[in-house]
Amino acid sequence: LHPETPREGRSLAELFAGRDIEPMKRQMRKHMAEAGLEYGERTHTYNSRLAQALAKWADTQNGGQAIYDALYRAYFVYNINLSDIGALVEIASGLSLDGNLARQVLEQRSFREAVDADWERARQLGITGVPTFYKNDLAVVGCQPYETLERFVKHLTKT
């Protein structure tokens, strides 16, 4: 999680300066392909606070759950800047959510407190990356093989 990321984003080369990121990108593409998930050629990381606010709002709307898949595709498949209000409004409108209301919510920062609360909870739990699966003080962080997640779930069902 990089809350300090500027609105225009940060190139992955800058974020991981001094490290060879190509092996990491190949590994990520491999994991995504194995999971049957689309994954584009990402060049940047973007500040996702506004996308999180949009998702909080969408949760209050009929059919809003579709926002999660749409935001995933926008970010990981199409490399769309998720801190751009216009792009987020377009994503919401594409799901038949009220684009004007989405813009208003984003411009007025109507869900700022809810997003802040989520970030504070993440800090309290020591969550520093996504995805993170957390339950009963146990966490699985980052892109993990299926077997790791399976062991995590099996452990949870035994306790």
Language model segments and positions:
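C-terminal cap of thioredoxin/glutaredoxin-like
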Residues: K56, T60, A66, A70-T159
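Structural alpha/beta surface segment adjacent to cysteine/selenocysteine redox centers
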Residues: L1-Y78
